[in-house]
Amino acid sequence: MDYPTLLLALLHVYRALCEEVLWHTSVPFAENMSLECVYPSMGILTQVEWFKIGTQQDSIAIFSPTHGMVIRKPYAERVYFLNSTMASNNMTLFFRNASEDDVGYYSCSLYTYPQGTWQKVIQVVQSDSFEAAVPSNSHIVSEPGKNVTLTCQPQMTWPVQAVRWEKIQPRQIDLLTYCNLVHGRNFTSKFPRQIVSNCSHGRWSVIVIPDVTVSDSGLYRCYLQASAGENETFVMRLTVAEGKTDNQYTLFVAGGTVLLLLFVISITTIIVIFLNRRRRRERRDLFTESWDTQKAPNNYRSPISTSQPTNQSMDDTREDIYVNYPTFSRRPKTRV
């Protein structure tokens, strides 16, 4: 191999390693995981192929309605599809007994007629839960059916180079929109929900979620990247609840806080009263024991004086005596 050819090969590898891979969905690594690929349109499917993206694209599996399914040898025992006939538009790839070597980027490429090529890139990362590591900066509450506008304004002074909006869920992050303001490129999202966004130079970045439903609730992240290397992140939590406006939600939270405070005060009062009663009872018992101890040596009674008159007692013991005697006749005796 001559020097120019070697240099071009090294340059190609360097660009492949350094170039940022734009993904549509990010999922955490697991031994048994699924990479979702659902084609939104109803065109005629001609071929589907899964790749793992690295320095080059390694083919994992390929399906054709005419020739059937072929899974490449390194993945034959580790991946499968639920719908073996591929009659539907769901081309989700399932892993069994995956290893850390399976962390990386995957591409699901569909070829349809007459729409053409449709591609989705999925990133597999080492993470337990996405929501747990992302605190929110603000909270927005809305009723179903309304249009919700999410806005982030950078504090950086450098010109913004790229803006990325994401929806964060516990087991998945979906890219909503990506704007490269330097090259004027808008990365097409594969998110099944319609999102309206502006991709223009300015101090604000805005997305609009029309006709929101309860399923739109969650965390939304705005990621701003400056040309000087500075980055800023804003996270907003959206709650879509039936019949609850911002004021009603605030009243609900305030009422719950007041009830919780009253409950804590009641419990504290009961505990204080119980401790005071217990303390008084212990003091009373201690005083009684001390009094009995002091009184025990003088526990005697004065003798009753016999010289004192007992008239009252004698009077009380006097009783009337009744005698039964025969009745004698009062007639005079007859003299002889």
UniProtKB/Swiss-Prot annotation:
GO cellular component: cell surface; external side of plasma membrane; membrane raft; plasma membrane
Keyword Transport: no
Source species, domain of life: Eukaryota
Stored Pfam families: V-set (PF07686)
Bilayer disposition of the protein: Single-pass type I membrane protein
Organism: Homo sapiens (Human)
Keyword entries, A-Z: Cell adhesion, Cell membrane, Disulfide bond, Glycoprotein, Immunoglobulin domain, Membrane, Phosphoprotein, Receptor, Repeat, Signal, Transmembrane, Transmembrane helix
Disulphides: 37-108, 152-222, 179-199
Annotated tissue distribution: Expressed by peripheral blood T-lymphocytes.
Region of interest (Disordered), ranges: 297-316
Listed Gene3D superfamilies: Immunoglobulins
Gene of this entry: CD226
Name of the protein in question: CD226 antigen
Polar residues bias (residue ranges): 297-314
InterPro entries per record: CD226, Ig-like_dom, Ig-like_dom_sf, Ig-like_fold, Ig_sub, Ig_sub2, Ig_V-set
Single Gene Ontology MF annotation: cell adhesion molecule binding
Phosphotyrosine PTM positions: 322
This protein's record includes keyword Ubl conjugation: no
Extracellular side of membrane: 19-254
Cytoplasmic side: 276-336
Positions annotated as glycosylated: 32, 83, 90, 97, 147, 186, 198, 231
Signal peptide: 1-18
Quaternary context: Interacts with PVR and NECTIN2. Competes with PVRIG for NECTIN2-binding. Interacts with ITGAL; this interaction mediates CD226 localization to lipid rafts.
Localization (cell): Cell membrane
GO biological process terms held by the UniProt record: cell adhesion; cell recognition; natural killer cell mediated cytotoxicity; positive regulation of Fc receptor mediated stimulatory signaling pathway; positive regulation of immunoglobulin mediated immune response; positive regulation of mast cell activation; positive regulation of natural killer cell cytokine production; positive regulation of natural killer cell mediated cytotoxicity
